[in-house]
Structures are given as C-alpha cells and as structure tokens.
C-alpha cells in the first residue's frame, strides 16, 4: 500500500510521464498530481481519450469544501483545546482528547496551504515545503497513535479496572502522549528528503513536489514510508481496536453495567468516526496501487487514472472532515464540554440581560431629566 500523502498540497512535474519507460510510481500521489496540473487540460485529455470527460469545476468545488472544513475545524478544535487546557482536574481521557484535538489542528492549519497549492503553485519556499510535508505525516501518525492509546486505556479501565488502575494516572497519560508525538516525529522525519520546491513547466512557477532524484537513498525512504504507513499507521492500530473493543463489549454485556458502557461511548465514537474517515482513502490507495502494477503508461489509461484522481481527492477530503467531526462528538457526548458550553451561554445571556437593564435605566433617567 502506498502512503496517504498530502496529495492536495504536493504536485508533480509531468515531464517524467511522457517517457514510456517511466512507470515506477513512488506514491499514488503522483497520479493525482499529474492530473491536477498539466494533464487536466482538456486538449491533452481529448488527445489521448475522447471518451473521458473532465470536469474543470471539480477543483474549485473541492477548494470551497476545504475552506468550510478549515472554518469549522479551526473553531471547533481551538474551542476544545482551550476548554480542556484550562480545566483544573483533568482525567487521563481529557489528556488524550486534548492531544487528539492538537493533532487535528495540525491538519486543519494545513488546509490554507492546500487550498493555495490547488491554484497550481507554491510560493512559500523550500523550507516550508519540507516542514508542511513532515507535519502532515506527524499529524497522521499522532492521530492514529493517540486513538490507539485511548482504546487501550478504555480496555484497562473496563476489563482490568483494579489491576491496572495505578497506571491510569494523568502523569502516565502525559508521558504516553509525549511518546506518541516523539515517535510520530521520528517516523515522519525522513519525508523531508522526499519533497522539494521544484520549478514547474514554467520557470516562474514552483511546486512542492516529490524530488526528481532517483538514487538508492530516496528509493529506500519511499519504501520505508510505505511500510510505516501500512503497518504502524493502519494494520497494528486496527488489530488493537478490534481486540480492545471486542473485550470491552463482552465485559460490558456480561456485567450488564450501563455506567461502563457510558464511559466508553465517547472514545468508541471517536474511533469509529476516525476509521470511517480514513478507510475510504486506504481503499482507494490500495486500488490505485494494484492498478499501477498492471498499467505501465498513464496516457494509455488516462480515463482510469483520472477517475482514481477524483476518488483520491474526495477520499482525502473525507479524511480531513474528521477534524470537524471530533469536536462535535465531544460536544454531543462529553458531559464536561456540554456543561461548560451551557455555563458559557448562561453567562452571555446573563450579561446581555444586565446590559439591557442598565441601558433601560439610563434611558429612563435621561428622559426624566428632560
């Protein structure tokens, strides 16, 4: 499986695709990037496949969706982070939710760069190109690791409540989250060697793209990232999720304890929504990888690659939508968040009533003077 790189942000030069012998695609991102730039011109598509239609407006629809996701995700996650950060008595679950929201913020604050790069140029320089590429992977790994930690914590809290209770402290939660962030950074750091700010067909336009170098080190890093994403970012977390929640479910059913079910509800919803948002991208990437093994030249199967590009774009947008869904889950299910929101709303309502009373008193006193 190839890696779910930030294909909406990173673009690829098309010169390589005009060579019939070039078909070793390092990541499925290349399919999208090629189509997203020069190959998206209607003249090129008509020249190679008259039966394949291209929707020029699709790119701008995706940009609008990304802007909406940025507004909702930034407001929601900043609210959750500020709410939990200033909470006095934080539980270990609060620590995990706080770090998960911070991980979502990494994706959310990349969206403006993604939107701008959809205009087919990168003006932010080579250093920021590398930083944003690494941050995407850091956000991906940290998101999966923290959700995994939340699942393990719920497993011990319900299946082994007495045996593992001394280890379920706030200090342990902070230590585990710091370890998850550090491991995410270590796993993501090789990406800085893969992406560069490279001039496009026009010398005045630069794009943050996969490097053109084909040495053994670059090839090794590409394979390494594919293995990391597939095994550490997907297979191992999925196995842990299935095992933990199977044991949790059997324990709750056996004990018939509604209180324990209520305690896992928010974590279970986060895990399920995250998987729903990530799995479509993985499926599309897997299909595209299989296709790349049996098709040697993009222009001979242009319509197929174009459809894969659209599928990757939409599935990537769904994965970003996760950043907006998590704050909604906290609000609907989390009792602390709901109570905090209600207290804030009541304070605002009370302040407005006080202002209205003061204003009416001033108005009446001024009228009496007149």
Swiss-Prot record:
Job of this protein: Putative chemokine receptor.
Biological process terms in GO annotation: calcium-mediated signaling; cell chemotaxis; immune response; positive regulation of cytosolic calcium ion concentration
Species of provenance: Swinepox virus (strain Kasza) (SWPV)
Keywords from the UniProt entry: G-protein coupled receptor, Glycoprotein, Host cell membrane, Host membrane, Membrane, Receptor, Transducer, Transmembrane, Transmembrane helix
Glycosylation sites: 6, 51
Gene Ontology MF annotations: C-C chemokine binding; C-C chemokine receptor activity
Membrane topology per record: Multi-pass membrane protein
Recorded family membership: Belongs to the G-protein coupled receptor 1 family.
UniProt-recorded name of the protein: G-protein coupled receptor homolog K2
Cytoplasmic topological domain residue ranges: 83-94, 153-171, 245-265, 322-370
